[in-house]
Amino acid sequence: SGYKTVHVETAGTLENYISADEKEKLIGLKLTGKLNTFDYDFMRTMPALESIDLAQIDNTTIPASCFKESTVKTVIIPDNAFSNSSIISINIPSSVVSIGNSAFDKCSSLAGNLHLPNGLQSIGNNAFRRCGKLTGDLCIPNSVMNLGSYAFNNCNFTTLILGTGITTIPEDCFSYGYNFTGNLIIPDQVEVIEDGAFNSCTFNGYLTLGSGLQKIGYIAFTGVSSSFASGHFNKIYCKATEPPVLSTYLDIENNCKYLGVPIGSKASYRATTYWK
């Protein structure tokens, strides 16, 4: 069929489970059990291999350059792959489609810019939580459809660009982003902003809420120094013709002097709980 699931009981023995014919023809591998450098080196010699699912391997340390110069197009980085490790940099290959839960959680030495490849589809819960030395622009590719709770909590990025594939911004996804500056644009495709999603962030430009937004969760934008987004948005635009459901007041009258809504929607906003 071109695809095979293999359980590797002893690290370094993957080649024992793959016949000579399979080595030449397999397109996809789903691996469980234990792997080491010898197993990754073996996979690099498989000329037709395009997809590797590592989500259920037991030992989660992935060697540097493990897929360099290989034919692999799709890789799943497993849960806890580098969690609480001392890695200082990461170059995520373009073949990666999924980053598992807590994959880089609490990697306090991981520093610099983070480039998320086009083609990435899923970022798990706590994926980059408490990676406090990650800085610069954070761009979520349009290909990403699933973001996990606390995925970028307690990082130090300066700007945030959200892709158009996201429909939900989950709980505390970007919370405690103390270095965020400038504008925040929520794409039209986003329907729900969950509790605490941008809690204690420091944006200081304008905020645009997309036309598809239906609900904003509790303390989604509440912050330390301001009731709305902890920074000081100078203008807020909400493109939704029907007011999104709010879990509490935004108190925008205390922190922002301008709220823009679509033509013909002013009366509806003024009549809606927490917006009026």
Predicted regions and their residues:
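The feature captures the LRR N-terminal capping module
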Residues: 2-22
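Structural signature of tandem-repeat unit edges
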Residues: 2-9, 27-35, 48-61, 67-80, ...
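Stable alpha-helical elements in mature extracytoplasmic
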Residues: 14, 38-39, 265
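Leucine-rich repeat
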Residues: 17-22, 42-45, 224-227
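A short acidic, amphipathic alpha-helical/loop segment
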Residues: 39-45, 248-249
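Membrane-proximal C-terminal cap and juxtamembrane stalk of leucine-rich repeat ectodomains
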Residues: 250-276
